[in-house]
Amino acid sequence: MMKHGKSEDVFKYIEKTNEKNLYRINKGLVPGMNVEGNIYVNEKLKLLIDEEIKMYQLNKCSTFLPAVIQIANVSTLPGIVKASIALPDVHAGYGFSIGNVAAFDMNNEKAVISPGGVGFDINCGVRLIRTNLFYNDIKDKQEELAQLLFNHIPVGVGSQGFILCNQNNLDDALSLGMDWSVKEGYSWIEDKLNCEDNGRSLYANSDYVSVRAKKRGITQMGTLGAGNHYAEIQIVDEIYNKKSAKLMGIEKKNQVCIMIHSGSRGLGHQIATDALIEMEKIMSKYKINVIDKQLACTPIHSPEGQNYLKAMGAACNFAWINRSSMTFLARQAFSKIFNQSPDDLDMHVIYDVSHNIAKIEEHFINGKVQNLLVHRKGSTRAFPPFHPLVPLDYQYCGQPILIGGTMGTYSYVLTGTEKAMENTFGSTCHGAGRALSRNKSRNALSYSDVLSNLKEKNISIRVASPKLIMEEAPESYKNVSEVVQTCHDSGISNKCFRLRPVAVIKG
């Protein structure tokens, strides 16, 4: 429940700071705030946040609380440090808003872990694969490529993959992550080196994944899923930092890349559901009273907290294997069309990032190094140059950050900064962020108009479910360029290069 009856009562707790694009949620907006909230938005994006508050009060919004209230609610959780942080693509979600970063002190025995701070699609993330092809090489094969990718990569709700495994293989996969993909021949060794955490969560233990979750995952390896997940053929449209782009193998405009956005499918969803049910029942044992039951949590070091961390790690490994399997299928498709090997086509993974995850990391807090459990829900890690966890290839430019746009709009590659380490626990945005609910999109937008707009932009589209055409239209989302520019201007990430889609594959 919102504490305040009028939107004006909420707005008085939100103040603009002297720092560009930074607003503060002061203590008092909701009872029991341990820290303040920080919101990174420019003036245009701030209007969308304000509108969400007003629409909720008029009962014209989703059943979720407005993002601003959710950011404040997260600040009440035990063990949170520094601030509850919202990034420019923030919007309401389950418990935590999407676009929220929150870190908890590992040395505080009361500090918590919350599945709502990770999300249901554990390790939903983005992978970018480069090629040595240019638009002129594919423009006459664009439709053929789109259809072949659609044929190769299983899409849609409940889709089943070509990468079949038995129960024993699944347990190995959940424990090993991309090491399993390399062993089975679905990944190159170089792929895992340019992947967050080398594509393997060391927390993972498949023993803590329920039988039901495993049953949901065993047939879904190498599947895209539905909703906002996609595989896109893109071309480099603009290069902002030539030195950094060159380190990623990008040197000229019109170079062809493939972007894959997917996660842990039904397996991750079931793990999140199982943990939320268990934690909601057990919170009273630890004398935890949350302001919103969707924030169900337990102490990090409790048996329940550790069980979730191990199961979540297994889901992370599944997601990395999932994106790796689709990389394998995309390489096959391109090889078939161009009659060259994927290696000859230089189909190397530039990077693979997660934007729904919780991880133990070291950060400076008040001049001291602390071990923190950083929850990133709809936000991306943004580590700077020379950070030990940044791959060797990118030590001089910082971690690549992959920002997916919307169907028919730009995507971006950014790099991490020191300011992100100082202000946002090494985090930045993850995408555009929804502006309209799926229901509103279906009611407000025309199927034929959206298809016509894509055709005008010469974008080939393949989609399993026609309703997704409206639900995933650019009008359903915030302006991704505004989101990216806000982060760039705030110094929490730097623009490197921009891509535009020429073919879109969706569930």
UniProtKB/Swiss-Prot annotation:
GMP binds at residues 228-232, 355-356, 404-407, 411, 430-433, 506. Mn(2+) 2 binds at C124, H261, H355. SUPFAM superfamilies: Hypothetical protein PH1602. It catalyses: a 3'-end 3'-phospho-ribonucleotide-RNA + a 5'-end dephospho-ribonucleoside-RNA + GTP = a ribonucleotidyl-ribonucleotide-RNA + GMP + diphosphate; a 3'-end 2',3'-cyclophospho-ribonucleotide-RNA + a 5'-end dephospho-ribonucleoside-RNA + GTP + H2O = a ribonucleotidyl-ribonucleotide-RNA + GMP + diphosphate + H(+). Belongs to the RtcB family. Keywords: GTP-binding, Ligase, Manganese, Metal-binding, Nucleotide-binding, tRNA processing. Its EC number is 6.5.1.8. Catalytic subunit of the tRNA-splicing ligase complex that acts by directly joining spliced tRNA halves to mature-sized tRNAs by incorporating the precursor-derived splice junction phosphate into the mature tRNA as a canonical 3',5'-phosphodiester. May act as an RNA ligase with broad substrate specificity, and may function toward other RNAs. Binds 2 manganese ions per subunit. Catalytic component of the tRNA-splicing ligase complex. This is RNA-splicing ligase RtcB homolog. The keyword Translocase does not apply. One of its GO terms (biological process) is tRNA splicing, via endonucleolytic cleavage and ligation. GO terms for molecular function: GTP binding; metal ion binding; RNA ligase (ATP) activity; RNA ligase (GTP) activity. Mn(2+) 1 binds at D121, C124, H229. GO terms for cellular component: nucleus; tRNA-splicing ligase complex. Ligation probably proceeds through 3 nucleotidyl transfer steps, with 2',3'-cyclic phosphate termini being hydrolyzed to 3'-P termini in a step that precedes 3'-P activation with GMP. In the first nucleotidyl transfer step, RTCB reacts with GTP to form a covalent RTCB-histidine-GMP intermediate with release of PPi; in the second step, the GMP moiety is transferred to the RNA 3'-P; in the third step, the 5'-OH from the opposite RNA strand attacks the activated 3'-P to form a 3',5'-phosphodiester bond and release GMP. It is an enzyme of class 6 (ligase). The gene is RTCB. The active site is at H430. Its cofactor is Mn(2+). The lineage of its organism: Eukaryota, Sar, Alveolata, Apicomplexa, Aconoidasida.
